[in-house]
Swiss-Prot record:
Its cofactor is pyridoxal 5'-phosphate. InterPro entries: Aminotransferase_I/II_large, AspAT/PAT-like, NHTrfase_class1_PyrdxlP-BS, PyrdxlP-dep_Trfase, PyrdxlP-dep_Trfase_major, PyrdxlP-dep_Trfase_small. Its EC number is 2.6.1.1. The gene is aspC1. This is Aspartate aminotransferase. The lineage of its organism: Bacteria, Bacillati, Actinomycetota, Actinomycetes, Kitasatosporales. Keywords: Aminotransferase, Cytoplasm, Pyridoxal phosphate, Transferase.
Amino acid sequence: MSAATPPTERRVSARVGAISESATLAVDAKAKALKAAGRPVIGFGAGEPDFPTPDYIVQAAIEACSNPKYHRYTPAGGLPELKAAIAAKTLRDSGYEVDASQVLVTNGGKQAIYEAFAAILDPGDEVIVPAPYWTTYPESIRLAGGVPVDVVADETTGYRVSVEQLEAARTENTKVLLFVSPSNPTGAVYTREQIEEIGRWAAEKGLWVLTDEIYEHLVYGDAEFHSLPVVVPELADKCIVVNGVAKTYAMTGWRVGWVIGPKDVIKAATNLQSHATSNVSNVAQVAALAAVSGDLTAVAEMREAFDRRRKTIVRMLNEIGGVLCPEPEGAFYAYPSVKALLGKEIRGKRPQDTVELAALILEEAEVAVVPGEAFGTPGYLRLSYALGDEDLVEGVSRIQKLLSEAKD
């Protein structure tokens, strides 16, 4: 429908109508629907730990349900005790010292990202987005009036962008750099030296930086997590940190995230949230309080399992002709290149892109994967290894069998 269409005839606004469905959630929903219909589908689509939330966190929520004070409205920006605990947890885990007044508690990381961009972007402001990227980032930027500018890295650099690439993408309209380490979808982890170089470049150019630290505790081997505002402290006044309990504590369904930033930005984002959703569910906030106040024993156990699965999935994927899978250093995703398989005949079909290849894998092997188009880089597939060991081996074995049939 054209922009000239009378307002009374436009059923959906152009702004919201332009938003794409979350590709990762769509793949996960399709896999679950097929399973419900009786097909033995194995899903590698969802970025979700397969572990239950630790019991001490659940018990805190159960107790909160019975406490009348949590049956009422609470401050829109979050329970004061949770904000203080998040500040303490941030200092403990990353060395970044912040005040509770710099914290906004949100309904998960997605709301945190949108509200952060909404608080600092004006129409036309550009945000440099290293690709491959998580599907939600560009949509949040556009909703906030900004313009995402992709900077693509591939497997030859371990999916890490360089300062030279970032500088080439910078214009007079550039306001923000999005920085994510460990990365979804690639599992890339930047070294301290790389973070320092990128951070100092951003500081010299006067840019804001939004850094997503949701996978801070999921790093493997010799890789280490480093918080950008700790490595480059002069960025603190123009740095926004997004985090949450979902990945570290297996709490994806509880929907608790947060934004840490300069007080004026947090105040603006809190005002926005006061009109959008008000406070996050009090029961979920109390559960998050128990999570961030506790130790990291549970995540250590999960990390050990993820590390084992990481090694298995990389080995098995690299056994497939035409597949190249770098070893991820963080998060829980493998991001193999399958460019060499595109256009080849597989069971009577010739997939021309990874959307078609992913559809073929789902139909023929009954395995759900996410095509690279969802992350801004066609020619790749994302597979989450946050699923049981047996399912992981069975699922990749099915993919091996199917793709071994590829021929010119």
